[in-house]
Amino acid sequence: MASGIAWTLHTAGMTRILLLEVAAPLAVRRRVSFCEAVHDGRQTVEGVTALAVADTAGVRSAWADGRLAVRVDPEWRSLPSLGADVVVDAILAKRNLGTRISDARLVIGLGPGFTAGEDVHRVIETQRGHHLGRVIEAGLAAANSGVPGSIGGETVRRILRAPANGVVANQVSIGHQVSAGQTVMTVADRPVTAGIDGVMRGLIRDGSRVPRGLKIGDIDPRGDVGYCDTISEKARAIGGAVLLTIMSSVCQ
C-alpha cells in the first residue's frame, strides 16, 4: 500500500516523499513496490522512480532529481532532521507499533490498530468492500476479518503462506502462469503449492527468511500478466484517500 500512496502523491505533484523501510523488506507484489530499491538501488513503478539513499543528504539529492527516496530506517530516526509535514503509517501491522499524533502536523494511519483523534489524526479504511478508502475522522477502521479480499471470486486459496519458519526458494517468478497443485516455492525445504490456476501476481524475494504463516505469494485467477506491473485498485483507492486527507488539511 505504501508504494501506491507514494505514487499517487508524487503524481499529484508532491515531490518530497521519503519511504522508510526495514533492512530486509518482505513485499510480495515486488514489481510495483518501491522497497525493491533497498536491494537494487532503484525501482520504477508506473513511471515514478525511487532511489535508495543512506542519509539526509541523499534524501535531498533524490528529491532534487525528481525521485522518491527510500531509506532503511525502521525506527523513523530520519523524521526530526527532515521536519516532516505529513506522516503516513503504512506498515499494516494491524496494531500501532509506536506512531504518535505528535509525529507531524498531519499523521495518518492505515487500517485497524489506530484511533483517529488519539494516536493519529485520520485513519484510512483498508478493508475491501463498500467502505474501502473511507477517511475516518474519529474512531477505528474495521477490525481485521482474517479473510483476504476477493479477486476473481477467490479469497483464501489465492494467497500463499509460509508453512514453516525458514528461507524461501522460489521455483517460479512473478508473471508466470501456474496451476493448482503446482509447487511454486519451498520454505525450509517444505513445498508450497498453488491453490488455484492463475498468474503469480506477487512473490516474496528469493532467499528471504520468513516466519510461519507470513504471506509469501499472491496468485491472480484473472490471468492478466499486465496486472503484475500495475498498482492495484485497492492501493489506488487508499492512495486517493491519503491525497484527499492531505489536501483537506491544507485547505482548512
Residue ranges of predicted features:
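Well-ordered secondary-structure scaffolds
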Residues: M1-Q252
